[in-house]
UniProtKB/Swiss-Prot annotation:
Entry cofactors: Mg(2+)
Binding sites annotated in the UniProt record for Mg(2+) 2: 224-225
Positions contributing to Mg(2+) 1 binding: 91, 225
Catalytically driven reaction(s): N-(5-phospho-beta-D-ribosyl)anthranilate + diphosphate = 5-phospho-alpha-D-ribose 1-diphosphate + anthranilate
MF-aspect GO terms: anthranilate phosphoribosyltransferase activity; magnesium ion binding
Residues annotated as binding anthranilate 2: 165
Cofactor note: Binds 2 magnesium ions per monomer.
Protein name stated in the entry: Anthranilate phosphoribosyltransferase
UniProt keyword NADP present: no
Function description: Catalyzes the transfer of the phosphoribosyl group of 5-phosphorylribose-1-pyrophosphate (PRPP) to anthranilate to yield N-(5'-phosphoribosyl)-anthranilate (PRA).
Lineage: Bacteria, Bacillati, Bacillota, Bacilli, Lactobacillales
Length: 341
C-alpha cells in the first residue's frame, strides 16, 4: 500500500480517508521501511495534506494507541506546539481551572518538543505521576474531572517514525496529528494551532473524527492559544456548522498584554506560575488562562458564552476551587503511588 500511496502523492494526487488510514497502519505496524516513511512524509508535506489524509492518519493513530476506557462528553484543551513562543503552560493551567468547575477534561500531552516545558514536564514538576495506567487515569477523570494521558505511553507505535522525523528536521503531518489522537476520544475540543491556514482544515478533521463542539484557534501574535497580546482567529464547530470569527481580549474586559509577559521557563518555573495563578495571583498570566479556560468552557457547554466562561473561570479561581483541584490531583496521585508501592 505505501508504494502506491507514495506514487500517488508524488503525482499530487490525494489519498482517500481509507487510503491514508491504511498506509499509516502499515507505518504504525512497522511494515514500512524508513526510506518509504520519509518519502511519504516528504511528499505529503510538499503537496499539503488534505482533510481526509489528516483524518485518516489520526484515525490510524487512535486505533494503534493504548486503549482508554469509554468516556462521554469529555473535553480536550491542547495546542499543536511549534509556535516557538516559550510561553508558560497555558493549556495545562487552563485545564486544571476548567476541571475545577466540574467539567471533565482528558488532557493528552507529551514532553517538550519545541518549547522548554511540555504538559508532561510541568505536571511532573507539580508533583503528579504522569505515567498512570489508563484505568488509574480514568479513575482520576471520574473523581477529579481531570486525567492526563501521557502520549509516549499511549502511542508506542510512534517509535517507527521517531528517527525519520528527527532526521527530516521539518514539520510533517505528525506535527498536527498529536492533538487529534487523544485515546479518550474527546467530543469537545479547544485546539490551538501554529498557523492560521490550519484553522478550517483541522476544524473539518475534528468533525470527521466525531467531535461535536470545537474551537480551533490561532493567536495573531503567533501563539497556538487564545492570546491576550493580539487578536485571535477562530473557527468554531457547533451543530455540524463551521463559523469563522475574530476576538480581542478587550471585548471580554481583559487588558491587551505584551507577549513577553506570557513567557515561561523551565518546568519548575512554569509549575510555580501555575501554582500562583491557581492560588489567585492577578496579572497577565492569569488573564490568558481566563481567556482560554473561558473558551474551553464555552466549547464544553455551548449555552455558556465565552464571556460567561471567563467569569466562571475567574470565580472558580477566586473561590479557591482551582487550587483545591490541584491539591486533589496531588493527593490522588500520591494515593495511587502508595498503592503501587
Amino acid at each position: 500500500m505505501i508504494k502506491q500511496a507514495i506514487e500517488k502523492v508524488v503525482n499530487h494526487e490525494n489519498l482517500t480517508f481509507e487510503e491514508s488510514e491504511a498506509v499509516l497502519d502499515e507505518i504504525m505496524n512497522g511494515e514500512a521501511s524508513e526510506v518509504q516513511t520519509a518519502s511519504l512524509l516528504t511528499a505529503l508535506t510538499a503537496k499539503n495534506p488534505t482533510i481526509d489524509e489528516i483524518a485518516g492518519a489520526a484515525a490510524s493513530m487512535r486505533s494503534h494507541a493504548l486503549a482508554f476506557p469509554e468516556t462521554k462528553d469529555v473535553l480536550e484543551i491542547v495546542g499543536t506546539g511549534g509556535d516557538h513562543a516559550n510561553t508558560f503552560n497555558i493549556s495545562t493551567t487552563s485545564a486544571i481551572v476548567v476541571a475545577a468547575t466540574g467539567t471533565q477534561v482528558a488532557k493528552h500531552g507529551n514532553r517538550a518538543a519545541s518549547s522548554k516545558s511540555g504538559a508532561a514536564d510541568v505536571l511532573e514538576a507539580l508533583g503528579l505521576d504522569i505515567n498512570e495506567t489508563p484505568a488509574v487515569s480514568y479513575e482520576s477523570l471520574q473523581e477529579n474531572n481531570l486525567a492526563f494521558l501521557f502520549a509516549q505511553e499511549y502511542h508506542k507505535s510512534m517509535k517507527y517514525v521517531a528517527t525519520v522525523r528527527k532526521q527530516l528536521g521539518f514539520r510533517t503531518i505528525f506535527n498536527i496529528l498529536g492533538p487529534l489522537a487523544n485515546p479518550a476520544h474527546p467530543t469537545h475540543q479547544l485546539l490551538g494551532v501554529y498557523d492560521e491556514t490550519l484553522l478550517e482544515p483541522l476544524a473539518n478533521v475534528l468533525k470527521k473524527l466525531g467531535v461535536t463542539n470545537a474551537m480551533v484557534v490561532h493567536g495573531r501574535d503567533g501563539l497556538d492559544e487564545m492570546t491576550t497580546a493580539d487578536e485571535t482567529a477562530v473557527v468554531e464547530l457547533q451543530d455540524d456548522h463551521l463559523t469563522k470569527y475574530t476576538v480581542t481580549p478587550e471585548q471580554f474586559g481583559l487588558k491587551r498584554r505584551q507577549r513577553a509577559d506570557l513567557v515561561g521557563g523551565t518546568p519548575e518555573a512554569n509549575a510555580d506560575i501555575t501554582r500562583r495563578i491557581l492560588a489567585g495571583d492577578h496579572g497577565p498570566q492569569r488573564d490568558i488562562v481566563l481567556l482560554n479556560a473561558g473558551a474551553a468552557l464555552h466549547v464544553a457547554h455551548p449555552a455558556l458564552s465565552i464571556q460567561a466562561g471567563i467569569d466562571l473561570a475567574a470565580k472558580t479561581i477566586d473561590d479557591g476551587k482551582a487550587f483545591e483541584e490541584l491539591n486533589r490531583l496531588l493527593a490522588f496521585s500520591d494515593k495511587r503511588k502508595d498503592v503501587v508501592a
